[in-house]
Amino acid sequence: MYIPLTKIYYSNPNDYAKIYSNKFNSESSEHLKFSNFDSELFFLYTKNIAHLLYDIQKHNGDVIKLCEKLPAVALTSFGRKCLIDEILQTNEIEGVHSTRKEISIIVENPSSQKRFHGIVNKYLKLSEDTEIEKAEDVRKIYDELVYGEIKSDDKNSILDGVIFRKDTVGIYTSTGKKIHTGLYPENKIIEAMTEAITILHSKEINSLIAISIFHYLFGYIHPFYDGNGRTSRFISSYYFSKELNPLIGYRLSYTIKENIKAYYESFEITNNKFNRGDLTYFIEMFLGVLNKSMTNLISALKGRLEKLNFYKEILVSEIGKRFDGNKKLINDELNLMYVLTQATLFSDDGITLNKLTEVIEKSTGKIRQLITNEKIKDLIIVNTQKRKHCYSADCSKLDEMNLSNC
């Protein structure tokens, strides 16, 4: 594990200056142009960074292969689940309370003007071009993502500058300890953000490293009074989803939340004046979070795919017995139950009647007939949410049937 200069300053004070000089002047160091920092920024291409970059690309290939094996309903259901989880987690990190239900409602109806519609719609459009070329582009993302909600919730956080904030802002721990002051005045914020964007698009730096550096610099600059964390995590998610499988863009905040102490600590260590502008520790941490996101994603996809194949075999056998001789009905009911099983395993809500009609390509009346058939309805769970019904497969019942046949 990389030992930051902040720790070396205290653990090895006699050699601190020499160690800093060796790191700074190393052939494996990369120096960055960023004016608004106490020291010249740099990082080292460590073995750990090389291993992380290799693992991330390998895991990306694994994710792509797994996604290719997934049926359409499973893939879209899982993407929706990950999107909702990501928004819940990015809000929770900032202490913003939101529920799965209110996020789900906006996902189903993106034109809704309910609370959080901005952030939901922005994540729904993660695959669309949201290029950042200048400071104004960052402000535009912020406006679309969180500003509407912030304006209505906290009048003190309304922006008062030309692009960003005009006044100072401090970053505090949960106990009220001040750990950082964002850049000030606004012309410095704009200058620093412009330089950070240049680093983000640098052809001289590995793109995943550049995204990690930009994520740190965004937190260091802190261009807004509120919403900085959610905006920077969205930007990182967007650029990671361009470089890797798009599902990765819906997993970043989830993994950051799981490693929140290390995440905040890496900011604090890197901000420390004794760290002398060395970004290596932060880069290793952030790439580690990305790598863990991918291993967690692989595990989640593998586990669900194994269960889907397992339940499919049970369904083929059971439905064949229940509708013996009626090949047309066997095919229709098996198709229905396979879709319901996908929605059950790969989402939290099941699937609506309208979506079933769309996916199975049969009329609403026909779908109702299949769902309410006396020979099959014991395998279906109906969840009523106001006027909307969501359907899912009773996987516990399928397990019981399988055990009784063992």
Regions found by a protein language model. Name each.
Residues 1-406:
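FIC/Doc superfamily catalytic core
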